[in-house]
């Protein structure tokens, strides 16, 4: 009688067993696909931020050279803002995506860039497109 009961238990419990196995297979497949999708998203987002930071750096270095050649008292305030932007860019953690204040520092850099553009009376239009990124005036 005990053998018959074990056979019936296997039949009755098959639904639960198949449900558990299906759940486990789905979980493993979803986890691996999630890792791939997360990696792809991180690469795209990191490339956009890198392009933006590179554009700010090039902009700041170009204006540093331009303002240095015609250093007058009027340009001293502009030069201080350029130097502050360059300092922020140099301190930015390019190789640490887990840095706690990454977004705060990025917002600070963007604010300093806007301040510099205002002082220079320049209207930047930074765009990241599939064909590349650019800063237009």
Swiss-Prot record:
One of its GO terms (biological process) is ribosomal large subunit biogenesis. Signal peptide: none annotated. Keywords: Acetylation, Nucleus. The complex LTO1:YAE1 functions as a target specific adapter that probably recruits apo-ABCE1 to the cytosolic iron-sulfur protein assembly (CIA) complex machinery. May be required for biogenesis of the large ribosomal subunit and initiation of translation. May play a role in the regulation of proline metabolism and ROS production. Residues 22-58 are annotated as: deca-GX3 motif. This is Protein LTO1 homolog. InterPro entries: Essential_protein_Yae1_N, LTO1_adapter. It is found in: Nucleus. Pfam families: Yae1_N. GO terms for cellular component: nucleus.
């Amino acid at each position: 009688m005990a053998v018959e009961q074990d056979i019936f238990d296997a039949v009755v419990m098959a639904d639960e067993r198949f449900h558990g196995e299906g759940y486990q297979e789905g979980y493993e497949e979803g986890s691996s696909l999630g890792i791939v999708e997360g990696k792809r998203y991180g690469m795209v987002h990191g490339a956009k931020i890198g392009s933006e930071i590179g554009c700010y750096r090039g902009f700041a270095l170009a204006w540093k050279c331009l303002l240095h050649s015609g250093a007058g008292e009027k340009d001293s305030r502009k030069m201080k803002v350029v130097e502050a932007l360059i300092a922020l860019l140099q301190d930015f953690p390019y190789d640490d995506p887990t840095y706690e204040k990454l977004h705060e520092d990025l917002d600070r850099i963007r604010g300093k860039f806007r301040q510099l553009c205002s002082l220079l009376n320049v209207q930047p239009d930074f765009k990241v497109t599939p064909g590349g990124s650019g800063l237009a005036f």
